[in-house]
Amino acid sequence: MPWSSRGALLRDLVLGVLGTAAFLLDLGTDLWAAVQYALGGRYLWAALVLALLGLASVALQLFSWLWLRADPAGLHGSQPPRRCLALLHLLQLGYLYRCVQELRQGLLVWQQEEPSEFDLAYADFLALDISMLRLFETFLETAPQLTLVLAIMLQSGRAEYYQWVGICTSFLGISWALLDYHRALRTCLPSRPLLGLGSSVIYFLWNLLLLWPRVLAVALFSALFPSYVALHFLGLWLVLLLWVWLQGTDFMPDPSSEWLYQVTVATILYFSWFNVAEGRTRGRAIIHFAFLLSDSILLVATWVTHSSWLPSGIPLQLWLPVGCGCFFLGLALRLVYYHWLHPSCCWKPDPDQVDGARSLLSPEGYQLPQNRRMTHLAQNFFPKAKDEAALPVKG
């Protein structure tokens, strides 16, 4: 195997280890914070932290279990019996099991001098599912936890060391999950245009900078009006859920479980953009961007008209320039990315190759694993991929 290929396999293995470590670190900091809140008599805060952890974990296990049930028979040849897998998911260990399975397969293909096409495709299959689950966990648990911690700090006027650790790990975890998910989507495209270092940095930064003002706006509103933030989230979430439902998603293995995906996507859209339907994304992205921006402006107007100071005595005017600066810088970097670094800007499809023709069959002629869930999403995110995949094979 060429050194470049072995280097790519090693890079994927290291990224898998780092992703799993980041998940465990984030989980540990959340549990640490919950214990500290309980010891300090802040039982409501501790209960909120644990509730967010529990809800996100249950959703993650449901996704994982439904996907495992729908995977082709015999695909996961060395996995435990179905009853053991069901028990693992019931104990909230299904996601960690998948992480271990991915790392084991990644180590296997890296150690082989000439890994088979099946082993390589199976490693990609596992990594793509992990990437999707990590994204769901990020917006179901990490982003709400980050908002909660910021609201607690702003309301109390104190910042404990474990809270700073939680904030740092949350921001990095969210941006990492978005970057890893976007990188995974690119591997599903016909020409497999991987993210370079420059485009990775730009993509990482614009997601971080645009997410920060949104989280800050909701956190400040929560600190000033803790009794109304749940109503605000529920009202906005229902509108976003209706929008997702009207787009007719078909991501899950069967229609009866599609609701889980739709409610999760509606939660993601509360914080960030996520494309769920076929067709050109620019119009939908602009509508969502304007909707979220209008909501954040209304939150800011609510602060200004009701109070100029937080309960902790911190003037709100100190936070507004920070949020605005991050927003405009993130918006500029987003425009740079989509104008010069997006795959559609330098699309170089192979006209002799149809999407899937390369990856569905091995040289020996047997079927290779293909993660149709992520391939479908990649075609939604990058419409040109579907257009090029539909080209007839020449020759």
Curated annotation (Swiss-Prot):
The record marks D355, G356 as: Cleavage. This is XK-related protein 8. Keywords: Apoptosis, Cell membrane, Cytoplasm, Membrane, Phosphoprotein, Transmembrane, Transmembrane helix. It is a multi-pass membrane protein. The chain crosses the membrane at residues 13-33, 48-68, 159-179, 201-221, 224-244, 259-279, 285-305, 313-333. The modification Phosphoserine is found at S362. PANTHER family: XK-RELATED PROTEIN, XK-RELATED PROTEIN 8. It is found in: Cell membrane; Cytoplasm, Perinuclear region. Belongs to the XK family. Undergoes proteolytic processing by caspase-3 (CASP3), leading to its activation. It comes from Pan troglodytes (Chimpanzee). The gene is XKR8. The lineage of its organism: Eukaryota, Metazoa, Chordata, Craniata, Vertebrata.
